[in-house]
């Protein structure tokens, strides 16, 4: 493949067009491009510099951040009035409140009627009933259910004791098992 020598003559693009600028325009553009090149990074100065707010200025001067608040500080510690804590109800009072709880009674009636409660209501009923049971236990009002004593099952006539089973094992003919 032969190489074509390029000519300097006017090609398909037409003659080159040059715009002449005045020297002042060239100088201005050069200065601008140099400034842009110089300012590639961040501004110099304090990293934590905050934006200037108008409230920092007082009478046209910058407010010194080192000056503190003008709020007076008490030098003597004053005792704060203590608020009275709610008295906890005694176990008897709490038990009376729970037993007379209208909402609990309504929910128990609904359960007895065969209605199924939602998970939240059922959980609430269970918690209140557990609390009532706990309080009754603390007050000694809870009747402890005695487990019923079940009689041991009578020994069947055909049942073998441990000694009988041991004798049977010892008298077994083990040779007859392996010859099948």
From Swiss-Prot:
Q: Could you list this entry's UniProt keywords, alphabetically sorted.
A: GTPase activation, Ribosome biogenesis
KW Phosphoprotein (keyword) present: no
- Keyword Hydrolase in record: no
Bias type Basic and acidic residues, positions = 18-33, 50-67, 77-88, 153-163
A Gene Ontology biological process in which this protein takes part is: ribosome biogenesis
This protein's superkingdom? Answer: Bacteria
Which molecular function GO terms apply here? GTPase activator activity
Q: Where is this region: Disordered?
A: 1-88, 147-180
Q: Which InterPro entries match?
A: YihI (IPR007336)
Query: What is a single Pfam family found in this protein's UniProt entry?
Result: YihI
Q: Where is the composition biased (Acidic residues)?
A: 164-173
Describe its partners and assembly state. Answer: Interacts with Der.
Q: Which family does it belong to?
A: Belongs to the YihI family.
Listed NCBIfam families: PRK05244.1-1
Function, as annotated, reads: A GTPase-activating protein (GAP) that modifies Der/EngA GTPase function. May play a role in ribosome biogenesis.
Q: What name does this protein carry?
A: Der GTPase-activating protein YihI
What organism is listed for this UniProt entry? Photobacterium profundum (strain SS9)
Q: Which gene encodes it?
A: yihI
